[in-house]
UniProtKB/Swiss-Prot annotation:
A lipid is attached at residue 37 (S-diacylglycerol cysteine). Residues 60-73 have a biased composition (Low complexity). Residues 40-77, 205-225 are annotated as: Disordered. Keywords: Cell membrane, Lipoprotein, Membrane, Palmitate, Signal. Residues 1-36 form the signal peptide. Disulfide bonds: none annotated. The keyword rRNA processing does not apply. May be involved in the stabilization of the cell envelope or may interact with the sensor protein CseC to modulate its activity, in response to cell envelope stress. This is Lipoprotein CseA. One of its GO terms (cellular component) is plasma membrane. The keyword Membrane applies.
Amino acid sequence: MRGLTDGRTPRGTRRTTQAASTAVAVFVALGVSLAGCGTGGTGARDEGPAHADAVGGAGSASPAPAAKASPSKAPDRVDAVRLVKADPKVSPEVKRELKPCVADEYPIDVSYGKVTDGSADDVVVNVLTCGDAVGVGSYVYREEDGAYQNVFKAEEPPVYAEIDRGDLVVTKQVYDKGDPVSSPSGENVITYRWASDRFTEEYRTHNDYSKAAGNAPTPAPEPDS
């Protein structure tokens, strides 16, 4: 998962917003009526396709065209880098990590959606490291009186926050003593819900990573005979 180390198999018990779109092809068979010979001596006759007035009766009104749905308004984009750097609640360590990796590309993920009861979309920001894209800070900003206010922060890396059906879901990887940085022992998945002007923890799930999967040594190549 983005923002977390990849030394273990990702969790299988929870996956947010997983969906697969399946395209369905519909084929319409066009029937062709074969003309038969009339018994009244009129000869062969071609029968064309049925018309709408033959099915629905003469003078049937054509159905009104379906109304087009108006496109949803895209959320206003914010300068997340400036927002984080100007935020006094963000630690100096995270601000030091927030620097361009290549040219003017910053290691930052930004999501827009509803996780509070504000009138505008909330902004979820994840600050990552440049080298391995590990999350070092997760924040939620809520618009209040025309300005964005920090209403949530988590700065215990590796950490990553997501919006899941109106809830805030934060994943934190955990380490046992002796675990290398690339191989955490598990993760805590914490779901927060907005109530009474703050986030409260609803529930949490702990997942242990396998110690065997993915750790088999790579066999040495056999010498050419």
